[in-house]
């Protein structure tokens, strides 16, 4: 497949590999796809069919497919995507939507038979023992910013960094606060790496504002990040799961 795809790339012909090796699925009855990021358009309006087609291959082997904790759509800006996903989603054995926007959108596509609504699974993750908000002087605001979401709003990382750096300056000036940068996703893909993105914002700031900011520059994991979140009075989050992390520790 890789050879075929490479050859076609020289001809500028896109080729989607629909599935990988399937030996590992022998003996399984059900496969869960957790989260809904693959069921949205990219910031440039494109879509990737690789994983959905792979999951359809599993269904052809008699394995049920459940999409759990999903946010889906919208696809109207890309008619090919709308047609593909409308057909694909109708095949899924169960779609568990995590919020009402997805619920209403899928109903508008007449996808009612295999649809239900339930809280995001992140709400059920157990907190570390005795994890309670810390008492301190002054205001600490935790901020999570995502290059992925910024691309949807601004179109380029450079523009987003400049605009959001200015927003951080205004926040510190008006609230007289300290800021804790909370990266949620650390990815090899720079366009999806919160830490690299927030470091770029930090580097844009004047020194006197940098002195009021601390960056979590490690990867403590989903649960480990809660220990930093409880230091905050408020959290502003681009990533849904970072926001849920804050809610579940009463911030």
Residue ranges and their predicted role:
Residues 1-251:
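Active-site anion-handling motifs in enzyme catalytic cores
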């Amino acid at each position: 497949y890789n050879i075929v795809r490479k050859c076609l790339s020289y001809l500028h012909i896109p080729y989607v590999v629909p599935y990988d090796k399937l030996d590992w699925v022998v003996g399984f009855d059900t496969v869960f796809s957790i989260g809904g990021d693959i069921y949205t358009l990219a910031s440039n309006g494109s879509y990737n069919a690789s994983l959905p087609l792979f999951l359809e291959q599993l269904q052809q082997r008699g394995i049920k497919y459940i999409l759990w904790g999903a946010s889906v759509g919208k696809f109207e800006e890309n008619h090919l995507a709308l047609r593909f996903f409308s057909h694909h989603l109708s095949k899924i054995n169960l779609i568990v939507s995590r919020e009402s926007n997805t619920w209403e959108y899928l109903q508008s596509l007449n996808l009612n038979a295999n649809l239900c609504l339930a809280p995001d699974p992140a709400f059920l993750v157990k907190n570390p023992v005795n994890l309670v908000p810390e008492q301190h002087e002054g205001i600490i605001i935790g901020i999570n910013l995502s290059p992925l979401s910024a691309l949807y709003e601004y179109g380029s990382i450079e523009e987003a960094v400049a605009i959001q750096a200015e927003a951080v300056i205004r926040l510190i000036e008006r609230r007289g606060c300290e800021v804790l940068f909370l990266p949620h996703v650390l990815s090899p893909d720079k366009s999806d790496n919160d830490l690299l993105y927030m470091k770029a914002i930090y580097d844009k700031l004047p020194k006197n504002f940098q002195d009021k900011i601390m960056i979590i520059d490690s990867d403590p994991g989903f649960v480990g990040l809660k220990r930093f979140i409880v230091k905050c009075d408020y959290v502003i989050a681009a990533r849904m799961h970072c926001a849920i992390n804050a809610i579940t520790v009463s911030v």
